[in-house]
Amino acid sequence: SSSSGFPTDSKIYGGLGWLAGPVLVFGRGRYALDRRRTPLADDGIINTIGVDLPDTEISVKDVFGLDTDMTVPAFKKRTEYVPEIDPSYCFDHDTTIAILASFAHSRKLMVQGYHGTGKSTHIEQVAARLNWPLIRVNLDSHISRIDLIGKDAIVLKDGKQITEFREGILPWAIQHPVALVFDEYDAGRPDVMFVIQRVLEADGKMTLLDQNKVIHTHGGFRLFATANTVGLGDTTGLYHGTQQINQAQMDRWNLVATLNYLPHEKEVEIVLSKAPSYNNKAGKETVSSMVRVADLSRAGFMAGDISTVMSPRTVITWAENSVIFGDVAVGYRMTFLNKCDELERSTVAEYYQRCFGEELPEYKTVASTAA
């Protein structure tokens, strides 16, 4: 057995791979719990997490550095379902407060914002510091109603093949102290969204029709979602595959936080935390210029000059690639410029020239070449 009390030799198989740990397998169309080997909670529900309800409280000011007297419930024990802590992570004040309120008061929270702004990572890093088990499910077009609820499966028991119901990720999660995060929430299929809608109710009970069973929500269950749009469809052309969300369902989310592009200095701080080799006077000036390029790309996108926008994730990748290639210009071309439409590349190259005071070699003007 592992240190958490879980059997490490369980023979459980899934479609795409392990979701977390040796007990739960999450794959496309298949979920399995080894019911013969997992410990039972006091109420008879199989507990594969290793913890029950939060057993301590933490100070938000001490742990997150936010100017508030708020305290939040947390777990003393750290299990394998808890995300790893990123000690250099920079928290956005409003988004972090919303996430902490969701954990403290069981509020269902959707975090909306542009790509690469750290929506899912914010939730993960808050959960990591609370020792709160967390599972992320990507609502791509292959996630179906059966995946979420479960299905009958043929299993081998006492040497005989029998049909047994295997729970999906949703009924499993709501019976455990888990933060369940639905990524790409606005890309979910309509039939999948209506499965989730019942769990969004105030009492959060879920009925399994195949089992004639009503599942009650565990006191430690929390529900989150991340989305690029706010359920009204995509008007930017950036997010193909997203769709409008039923407004009756949107109304059930208790909180909606918006995490878009951050102030210049805050974004510089985040990039420096991820690329510490730039943490010197010259490096800080370089990173500040990188963020200015990103600011220009966003202004150009809003004005309709370009159709590709540079996210904070892109800036971090640019900084990392520049270290690899030893050249900021090469890093820019490899990270962002080559992703842009050919007709827009001269404009994107001009952003670089305006911020760094030099032109990219392949985009030098005739005048500058003559000079």
Regions found by a protein language model. Give the residues of each.
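Alpha-helical lid/collar subdomain of P-loop NTPases
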Residues: R37-T79, T96, P263-H264, L272-A371
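Hydrophobic transmembrane alpha-helix bundles
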Residues: Y31, L148-L156, A179, F224-V230, ...
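Charged low-complexity interaction tracts in eukaryotic proteins
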Residues: S4-L19, V23-R35
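AAA+ P-loop NTPase catalytic core and its hallmark functional loops
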Residues: G17, G27-G29, R37-K284, R292
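DNA-binding alpha-helical recognition surfaces that contact promoter or target DNA
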Residues: G14, Q125, T317
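Single, functionally critical "micro-switch" positions that shape active/binding sites
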Residues: P7, A227, M310
